[in-house]
């Protein structure tokens, strides 16, 4: 009897049906609801080996110990739901540490990268009183609103000499820009 594993979730689901019995007609119950059809993957996780070492590239100025980066292709949207999805990834990453609070929330940042400026997202932030601060050309910070510091990187606005590689992630690359990239490789 000691090795018996109690399945609590079916009992919980049944109990919630009974608790909310007066409104069963108005409710939908989805037990063990799949949040996603594919495995949840972070586009890029950048871990600072030594937290006191400053990152020279301005994209890394916001970095703490754990830095989650989400890339959106030129055709992908970057809206408020993408922000919340990325926050959810960060929350899961934080909670899956090897021990309780092994990954402290204060040591996590989020970076969302896209070619075009997410005008709709910035409008939403303004309407909701969320401060978006332009920190550098093409780099916008959002502090003190969500659980983690967020930066939005607009690759089209970045200075080419410092960010040639990110700026190359476009469908509109020009021949002279391609030649500059090839020279950088050689």
What function would you assign to each model-found segment?
Residues 1-186:
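Elongated, amphipathic alpha-helical interaction scaffolds
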């Amino acid at each position: 009897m000691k090795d018996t594993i109690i399945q609590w979730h079916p009992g919980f689901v049944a109990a919630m049906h009974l608790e909310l019995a007066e409104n069963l007609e108005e409710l939908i119950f989805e037990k063990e609801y799949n949040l996603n059809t594919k495995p949840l993957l972070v586009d890029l996780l950048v871990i600072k080996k030594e937290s006191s070492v400053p990152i020279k590239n301005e994209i890394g100025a916001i970095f703490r110990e754990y830095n989650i980066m989400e890339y959106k292709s030129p055709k992908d949207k970057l809206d408020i739901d993408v922000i919340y999805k990325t926050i959810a990834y960060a929350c899961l990453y934080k909670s899956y540490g090897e021990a309780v609070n092994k990954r402290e929330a204060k040591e996590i940042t989020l970076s969302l990268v896209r070619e075009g400026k997410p005008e709709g997202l910035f409008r939403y932030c303004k309407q909701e009183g969320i401060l978006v601060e332009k920190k550098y050309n093409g780099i916008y910070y959002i502090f003190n609103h969500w659980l983690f510091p967020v930066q939005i990187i607009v690759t089209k606005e970045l200075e080419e000499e410092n960010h040639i590689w990110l700026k190359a992630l476009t469908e509109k690359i020009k021949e002279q820009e391609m030649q500059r990239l090839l020279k950088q490789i050689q």
